[in-house]
């Protein structure tokens, strides 16, 4: 069974289109109006070993908040759809990733109980067109819509770029590992995820 999804989400504020194939490493195309966010999305999808296209149009381009939130929602929905009933997935994963002085831990459970606990000390208020206050919000919106319980904790570091990038790398690697097929069972005592 192919594990991919095409999801479009359009509001009065944005139009987001996501194609995601979690089993085929291939081309990644990302286009949003926020340069640093493009870099982080490419990083996330690369470390997920996926094929993906993310296109985001901001209909009210006065702030980056709506783009960040709506991409997170749509990407989360795409992962949830691609996983289907989650039969056979490993389900859990954690990664501790360094980027120079920064060290970030990501631990997740594809539980269908989407929530995020984010502990990042981001000293810069903006980087490459992205308000850093939207980074935790991205992770929260993504987790809620993907059905992933997500913990992200900064263990060390002071460079905002490094901390954020280590977070996206760790999330990508953890998602890759947790979505791997390891058997034909639903990994839950309930028999359903």
From Swiss-Prot:
Keyword Aminoacyl-tRNA synthetase carried by entry: no
Entries under Gene3D superfamilies matching the protein: Imidazole glycerol phosphate dehydratase, domain 1 (3.30.230.40)
E.C. no: 4.2.1.19
GO CC list: cytoplasm
Main location: cytoplasm
Keywords of this entry: Amino-acid biosynthesis, Cytoplasm, Histidine biosynthesis, Lyase
GO MF entries: imidazoleglycerol-phosphate dehydratase activity
SUPFAM superfamilies: Ribosomal protein S5 domain 2-like
Pathway: Amino-acid biosynthesis; L-histidine biosynthesis; L-histidine from 5-phospho-alpha-D-ribose 1-diphosphate: step 6/9
Reaction catalyzed: D-erythro-1-(imidazol-4-yl)glycerol 3-phosphate = 3-(imidazol-4-yl)-2-oxopropyl phosphate + H2O
Compartments, record wording: Cytoplasm
Domain of life: Archaea
Keyword Cytoplasm attached: yes
Broad class of enzyme this protein falls into: lyase
GO BP term, pick one: L-histidine biosynthetic process
PROSITE patterns associated with the record: IGP_DEHYDRATASE_1, IGP_DEHYDRATASE_2
PANTHER family, per database record: IMIDAZOLEGLYCEROL-PHOSPHATE DEHYDRATASE (PTHR23133:SF2), IMIDAZOLEGLYCEROL-PHOSPHATE DEHYDRATASE HIS7 (PTHR23133)
Record family assignment: Belongs to the imidazoleglycerol-phosphate dehydratase family.
Matching HAMAP family: HisB
Name under which the protein is recorded: Imidazoleglycerol-phosphate dehydratase
Native source organism of the sequence: Saccharolobus islandicus (strain M.16.27)
Gene: hisB
